[in-house]
C-alpha cells in the first residue's frame, strides 16, 4: 500500500525549491516512478477457510490516496480488519477515511490496537471512539475496537504474532508476524526478547529510513543491514524510505551485496504485490 515516511515522497518543499536539488523527489512526480511513496502500510489478502479476507496494517494520513490507487487496481473492495502498529499520524491518521467503507461497503470494521495507542485515539479520534458526542445522523467511521496484548491473536483465521520493538527512546511500536512473514515498519531498536519471534523468517519487511545512518526513531540502511545479517531471513524488503533513498541506486547497491554476501534484499515500492503461502 505504501512504503514512505510520514510526509511522503515527493516533498512539496523539494518540488518548489528553485534549485531543484532533490533528484528523488523530481523523479517521484513521474507516473509510475518507484520513488513515489506514501505512508507505510501493507494489505494482507488471506484466503482462509471462510473465504478471502483483506487485513490492513495501518491506515495513515495518506491511506485514502493509496486506496484510490491500489484497491481498484487489485480488485479490493472490503476491509475486514485493521491492525495498528503505533499511534503516530502516519499509522492512524486515515481512520476517519474508513467511513467510505462503513457507509457504503460494509457495516463496520474491526480495529486491533494496543491499549497505549487506544488511549491516544481517544484524544485524536474522540468522535470515532465515542460516537455519542457527534450530531445525530452524522456519518463517521463505524469501528469496533479490540485491544491487543503482546501475545498472538487470530484475525479471520490468520494467526498474528506481535513483535514488540522500540520506535524511539521509551516509545513502543509493534511489528507483526503472520506465517513466516515478519513486518517491522517503525523501529529504532529490537529488544532481545523479540529475536526468538523472528526465527525462521522467510520474508522480512524492515524499516530503512535513509542510506547513511539511523535516526533517533528509525533504522537507517547500515543498521538495517546489520539486523538482516543477524536475523537471516530468506528475503528482505525494506520500507519506510525517505527522499534520500533513490530506488534504483540503492537497489543496485543491494544487488552487489547479494553477489558478495548472498543476501536477497531490495527496496520495496508502493503497489508491490508479493505472493506468499500462509
Residue ranges and their predicted role:
Residues 1-184, 193, 251-278:
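Binuclear metal-dependent hydrolase catalytic cores
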Residues 190-278:
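Binuclear metal-ion centers of metallo-dependent hydrolases, dominated by the metallo-beta-lactamase
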Amino acid at each position: 500500500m505504501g512504503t514512505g515516511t510520514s510526509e511522503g515522497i515527493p516533498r512539496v518543499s523539494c518540488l518548489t525549491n528553485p534549485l531543484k536539488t532533490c533528484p528523488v523527489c523530481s523523479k517521484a512526480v513521474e507516473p509510475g516512478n518507484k520513488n513515489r511513496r506514501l505512508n507505510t502500510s501493507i494489505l494482507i489478502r488471506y484466503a482462509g477457510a471462510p473465504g478471502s479476507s483483506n487485513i490492513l496494517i495501518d491506515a495513515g494520513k495518506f491511506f485514502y490516496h493509496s486506496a484510490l490507487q491500489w484497491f481498484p487496481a487489485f480488485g479490493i473492495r472490503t476491509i475486514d480488519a485493521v491492525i495498528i502498529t503505533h499511534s503516530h499520524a502516519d499509522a492512524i491518521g486515515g481512520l476517519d477515511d474508513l467511513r467510505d467503507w462503513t457507509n457504503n461497503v460494509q457495516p463496520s470494521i474491526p480495529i486491533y490496537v494496543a491499549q497505549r495507542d487506544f488511549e491516544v485515539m481517544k484524544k485524536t479520534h474522540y468522535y470515532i471512539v465515542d460516537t455519542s458526542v457527534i450530531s445525530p445522523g452524522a456519518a463517521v467511521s463505524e469501528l469496533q475496537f479490540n485491544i491487543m496484548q503482546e501475545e498472538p491473536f487470530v484475525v479471520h483465521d490468520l494467526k498474528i504474532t506481535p513483535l514488540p520493538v522500540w520506535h524511539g527512546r521509551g516509545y513502543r511500536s509493534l511489528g507483526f508476524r503472520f506465517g513466516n512473514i515478519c513486518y517491522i515498519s517503525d523501529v529504532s531498536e529490537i529488544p532481545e526478547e523479540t529475536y526468538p519471534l523472528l526465527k525462521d523468517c522467510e520474508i522480512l519487511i524492515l524499516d530503512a529510513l535513509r542510506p547513511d545512518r539511523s535516526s533517533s526513531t528509525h533504522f537507517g540502511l547500515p543498521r538495517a543491514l546489520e539486523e538482516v545479517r543477524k536475523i537471516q531471513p530468506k528475503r528482505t524488503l525494506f520500507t519506510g524510505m525517505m527522499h534520500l533513498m533513490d530506488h534504483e541506486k540503492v537497489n543496485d547497491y543491494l544487488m552487489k551485496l547479494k553477489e558478495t554476501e548472498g543476501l536477497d534484499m531490495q527496496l520495496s515500492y508502493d503497489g508491490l504485490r508479493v505472493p506468499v503461502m500462509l
